[in-house]
Design a protein with these regions (language model features):
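Extracytoplasmic/periplasmic cell wall- or extracellular glycan-interacting regions that localize
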Residues: 1-86, 90-92, 100, 116, ...
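Activation segment
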Residues: 82, 106-107
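Conserved ATPase active-site switch/coordination loops adjacent to the nucleotide-binding site
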Residues: 85, 111, 128
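Extended non-globular C-terminal regions
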Residues: 99-102, 110
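Acidic, glycine-anchored pre-beta loop/turn
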Residues: 107-119, 138
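Active-site loop architecture of trypsin-fold serine endopeptidases
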Residues: 124-132
């Protein structure tokens, strides 16, 4: 009887873990499903050389129309001001994905706010365009693989 109970508990735990894994996978961002966060021209691409051996880990856009939009739906997990990066907005999308928006003049959102894909979240300044980075499980990934084709 004890062995049968242990087997049932183990099977139940396995089922729960499988459900969690399936739910997490369902939240993963699919290739070419994200909206472009800026209408600006891409000035620097992911992986291109920035200086010396340093490479860009995201995309740098020209100022465009100065509007910054959420690439995907999610929750704002951070809004902070940094000396060299302006107002930084970070959105968590689930499935291990976050998007980072830098060089903003301001944010229209605060930590904890839910945002929809394409929703206006801030404005860039007139001198620097938007810097956009996408990360999966803490590692920078090429946004071009996840953004819709223009």
């Amino acid at each position: 009887e004890e062995q049968g109970k242990a087997e049932r508990l183990a099977a139940e735990q396995q089922r729960k873990e499988a459900e969690q894994a399936a739910a997490e996978k369902a939240r993963e961002i699919r290739r070419h499903s994200l909206s472009w966060p800026s209408t600006g021209q891409v000035l620097n691409k992911f992986g291109s050389i920035r200086s010396g051996q340093v490479r860009w880990k995201g995309l740098l856009f020209s100022t465009g129309n100065n509007l910054v939009k959420a690439a995907g739906s999610g929750t704002v997990v951070m809004v902070t001001s940094m000396k060299r990066l302006g107002t930084v907005i970070i959105v968590e999308h689930g499935g291990g994905f976050i998007s980072i928006y830098c060089n903003n003049l301001n944010s229209l959102k605060k930590q904890g706010d839910h945002v929809e894909q394409g929703e206006l979240i801030g404005y860039t300044g007139s001198s620097q365009g938007l810097y956009f980075e996408l990360r999966k499980d803490g590692e920078s990934v090429s946004p071009a693989e996840y953004l819709r084709r223009r």
